[in-house]
Amino acid sequence: MEVLAKHRFARTSAQKARLVADQIRGLPVAKALEILTFSPKKAAVLVKKVLDSAIANAEHNEGADIDELKVGAVFVDEGPTMKRIMPRAKGRADRIMKRTSHITVVVSDR
């Protein structure tokens, strides 16, 4: 049984979120939550929230035992980028790229 949860349009770059996702892939959920809780990265908070949601989905919808769940797959895809302009000196302007990402966590009992 596989259960997934998604956070779409998360306000972090996919590159930064993937660093966190790579740390928990394939681990038991208890160990993964422990790692995410003590990680100093902003993306760890976002990934932890999605993992908690996936665990709750597995327990509520499938009646799964939390102690047997493992993080099956974690992937982070790029979302749309919001483009903003920052005025600079002498009439110039720079582009600010506000990147978003889609975080998906799959938990399974296998």
Curated annotation (Swiss-Prot):
One of its GO terms (molecular function) is structural constituent of ribosome. It comes from the Bacteria. Keywords: Ribonucleoprotein, Ribosomal protein, RNA-binding, rRNA-binding. The keyword Cell membrane does not apply. One of its GO terms (cellular component) is cytosolic large ribosomal subunit. Belongs to the universal ribosomal protein uL22 family. Part of the 50S ribosomal subunit. This is Large ribosomal subunit protein uL22.
